[in-house]
Amino acid sequence: KRFVFPFPVLNDKKITGYILSKYRLKTINDVLSICPNGLYPFAFFFNGALISCDAIKQIGNVDKNFFIAGEEVDYFYRLRAVGKVLTDMNAHHYHPNVYERTWSDLKIYYYTKNTIILNKRHLNMATLRNIFFAVVATFYRIFLHNGWTGIISYLYRNNLKFLVIAIQRGLNGRVGIDFLDKK
């Protein structure tokens, strides 16, 4: 059975090229083939997560400024800064298939902006190349959730303006609820 969220293949520093890694572990057997003990040093939050109270005391709560997209990624990297974060392949939980839902303009805006912020903040990836990949990843996600018509709407309608604003605000590190802000 395939994961709803395939696990990334990690490098020697246990870091993933989170934006567009072409190597993904799509099944439990894929993970077990490289991690036979079943404890993989990566996690998707928050479904099924068991988090130490001590870790929460050290890093605080979820950053609500990562509205709609990215709060789980930010929390993962903050947790990892204070200790190990693992997924136990013996613990199973169900998550509905997220690809059956279309993404709104709001979701696309925050996904784009927050992906850029997270890559700058936690992966030191503020290069033009990585920003380009963040935008490509956004278009890939639009395609997965909304199909070709979704992509076309971002290239030829008013939606392109929102995408450019999301990129600018991501580069500026502007977190928070600001979709309708004019500045």
Regions found by a protein language model. Name each.
Residues 1-59:
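Acidic/His-rich active-site region of diverse nucleotide-sugar glycosyltransferases
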Residues 58-59, 96, 118:
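Residues that scaffold the ATP/ADP-binding catalytic core of kinase and kinase-like folds
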Residues 97-101, 146-147:
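Short acidic, glycine/proline-rich loop/turn micro-motifs
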Residues 106-114, 125-183:
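Non-catalytic, C-terminal membrane-associated alpha-helical segments of glycosyltransferases
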Residues 57-58, 124-126:
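Short helix-loop capping/hinge motifs at secondary-structure junctions, enriched
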Residues 65, 101-105, 153:
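Short glycine-enriched, charge-decorated loop/helix-capping segments at active-site entrances
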Residues 43-51, 55-61, 65-92:
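A short, conserved alpha-helix in the catalytic core of glycosyltransferases
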